[in-house]
Swiss-Prot record:
Entry's Gene Ontology cellular component terms: cytosolic small ribosomal subunit
Annotated organism of origin: Streptococcus sanguinis (strain SK36)
Keyword Membrane: no
Lineage: Bacteria, Bacillati, Bacillota, Bacilli, Lactobacillales
GO biological process: translation
Family recorded in the similarity comment: Belongs to the bacterial ribosomal protein bS18 family.
The gene coding this protein: rpsR
PROSITE patterns in UniProt: RIBOSOMAL_S18
Disulfide bonds: none
The name this protein goes by in its record: Small ribosomal subunit protein bS18
Length: 79
């Protein structure tokens, strides 16, 4: 049986960064924006982590994949 947490800790609602900043087109050349949605290892972060909507997550995903093909972003970041 799962135990309930005690205390007043309340999880903060994640805000869709793209919708909040009114970005209509996610450009694949804007690697600074796209790097917010990629992990340290180079993997695309899921919606539950970034807080983006489904529509904007699809835009981000296609932009990241285009940037990878154009060699603007790495497929894998091995440090």
């Amino acid at each position: 049986m799962a135990q309930q947490r005690r205390g007043g800790f309340k999880r903060r609602k994640k805000v869709d960064y793209i919708a909040a900043n009114k970005i209509e087109y996610v450009d694949y050349k804007d690697t600074e924006l796209l790097s917010r949605f990629v992990s340290e290892r180079g993997k695309i972060l899921p919606r539950r982590v970034t807080g983006t909507s489904a529509k904007n997550q699809r835009k981000v995903t296609t932009a990241i994949k285009r940037a990878r093909v154009m060699a603007l972003m790495p497929f894998v970041n091995e440090d």
